[in-house]
Amino acid sequence: QILLTQSPAIMSASPGQKVTMTCSASSSVSYMYWYQQKPGSSPRLLIYDTSNLASGVPVRFSGSGSATSYSLTITRMQAEDAATYYCQQWSSYPPMLTFGAGTKLELK
């Protein structure tokens, strides 16, 4: 089983500030996915296959990383970006879907 550890657990940023959060895997993974969730809403896919932007996601979001170390960056924080962000990986053998515990991003 692969454990995903997200850091920090909670962070705050001012409008216009660059934000970076990380996701560390206990074993090497091929790809990472990132989701944004706001209270009362379903998770929204932001990044797939580590660095590809999902449809309709603003270009201020980007993903990077490899092996056991991955990150999500917001180049310029906006008020609507306040949310909880989750990383997720898919292992084909054995078939397993794993999520991190989340990073809560608050507006400062």
Swiss-Prot record:
Residues 24-33 are annotated as: Complementarity-determining-1. InterPro entries: Ig-like_dom, Ig-like_dom_sf, Ig-like_fold, Ig_sub, Ig_V-set, IgV_Light_Chain. Residues 56-87 are annotated as: Framework-3. Residues 99-108 are annotated as: Framework-4. One of its GO terms (biological process) is adaptive immune response. Coiled coil: none annotated. This is Ig kappa chain V-VI region NQ2-6.1. It comes from Mus musculus (Mouse).
